[in-house]
Amino acid sequence: MSKRDFYEVLGVPKNASDEEIKKAYRKLAMKHHPDRNQGDAAKPAEEKFKEAKEAYEMLSDPQKRAAYDQFGHAGVDPNMRGPGGAGAEGFGGFAEAFGDIFGDMFGGRRGAGGGRQVYRGNDLSYAMDITLEEAAKGKEAQIRIPSWENCETCHGSGAKPGTSAKTCTTCSGTGTVQMRQGFFSVQQTCPHCRGTGKIIPEPCVTCHGQGKVKKQKTLEVKIPAGIDDGMRIRSVGNGEPGTNGGPPGDLYIEIRLKKHEIFERDGDDLHCQVPVSFITAALGGEIEVPTLQGKAAIDIPEGTQAGKQFRLRGKGIKGVRASYPGDLYCHIVVETPVKLTEHQRKLLRELDDSLKKGGGKHSPSGESWTDRLKNLFT
């Protein structure tokens, strides 16, 4: 049976870049991996896996690819080459293409020279409540977060004073063990030492063998002006410590805006309810409204109705990524007077009688409302 074209196997054109070839191989290898195909699908998947591996090994090597492009399969056939020809390479190509994938999948990477696996520390989160004014202007704050320091009892070794850690006999100090499944070999974290390569027979009673103790430290945090609810600030390296010399995680500070007694935020805009007496709404006049920058004046036109919206440009918040501030929207709430005296009631009745004599012209919706009622009941 003749071999398929290597480019056809990977599904890439002949002028594909090295990165395109690598991505195509990754996709096929994950799809046809023996662990993902069981039963009747196992054998065909294994063949396709081997085929993709062979194609990648040839096309990922510049010299082999050049020979293949010029002579086809004959150019890379070991039976057609001298002693210096390509021989079996095991899983070299697979490890090269998938080393970073499996490193991320299991949370660890091999140290330099194939040593113990190192693990990045976990990220930490911290919720910070701030006021709307603080969000608008920005602020500097101090927060208390967990920190891990070397244990003073064992000086960071994790072992009881007078004793020492021993090399793990399961993994011979490498921190990893090899697991074979058919022809495929997988490297896993040693379950005995959990990737450290060391076993502590007598743990330190202070740190329980961890070598570090948890304490608290104060961190200075700068909150940028314009930050909004739900945004996060990243503090690099202030998360949990790594394992086996791995880098620490990061700290994420999540901002939570406190409810404001006057304003509601909508992106960079602000909204507020402005109460107005029905006299001012009817006759018009100037009123004062609050803003984050102080007081501002609004001219209320005669006959203003409840729900009328007034826009004050630039009186909102300048967001973190914004070039200019948002606006303030003032929503008019016409107040109905309460606890009236008898004299005040009499005056209002007289006003009501006078308005009724004018028909619907004194009410912006009076005539249309009356017409709709007539149509409904006729």
Swiss-Prot record:
Cofactor binding, note field: Binds 2 Zn(2+) ions per monomer.
Keyword Cell inner membrane in record: no
Binding site for Zn(2+) 1: 151, 154, 204, 207
Localization, UniProt: Cytoplasm
Annotated keywords: Chaperone, Cytoplasm, DNA replication, Metal-binding, Repeat, Stress response, Zinc, Zinc-finger
Cofactor: Zn(2+)
Biological process (GO), any one: DNA replication
Repeat region (CXXCXGXG motif), residues: 151-158, 168-175, 190-197, 204-211
CR-type Zn finger ranges: 138-216
Record SUPFAM superfamilies: Chaperone J-domain (SSF46565), DnaJ/Hsp40 cysteine-rich domain (SSF57938), HSP40/DnaJ peptide-binding domain (SSF49493)
Gene3D superfamilies: DnaJ domain, Heat shock protein DnaJ, cysteine-rich domain, Urease metallochaperone UreE, N-terminal domain
Residue spans of biased composition, Basic and acidic residues class: 369-378
Positions of Zn(2+) 2 binding: 168, 171, 190, 193
Domain J intervals: 5-72
GO MF annotations, alphabetized: ATP binding; heat shock protein binding; unfolded protein binding; zinc ion binding
Lineage top rank: taxon: Bacteria
InterPro entries: DnaJ, DnaJ_C, DnaJ_domain, DnaJ_domain_CS, HSP40/DnaJ_pept-bd, HSP_DnaJ_Cys-rich_dom, HSP_DnaJ_Cys-rich_dom_sf, J_dom_sf
Annotated segments matching region Disordered: 354-378
GO cellular component, one term: cytoplasm
Matches recorded under HAMAP family: DnaJ
PANTHER family: CHAPERONE PROTEIN DNAJ, DNAJ HOMOLOG 1, MITOCHONDRIAL-RELATED
Domain-level remarks: The J domain is necessary and sufficient to stimulate DnaK ATPase activity. Zinc center 1 plays an important role in the autonomous, DnaK-independent chaperone activity of DnaJ. Zinc center 2 is essential for interaction with DnaK and for DnaJ activity.
Family: Belongs to the DnaJ family.
Function, as annotated: Participates actively in the response to hyperosmotic and heat shock by preventing the aggregation of stress-denatured proteins and by disaggregating proteins, also in an autonomous, DnaK-independent fashion. Unfolded proteins bind initially to DnaJ; upon interaction with the DnaJ-bound protein, DnaK hydrolyzes its bound ATP, resulting in the formation of a stable complex. GrpE releases ADP from DnaK; ATP binding to DnaK triggers the release of the substrate protein, thus completing the reaction cycle.
Subunit field text: Homodimer.
Protein name according to UniProt: Chaperone protein DnaJ
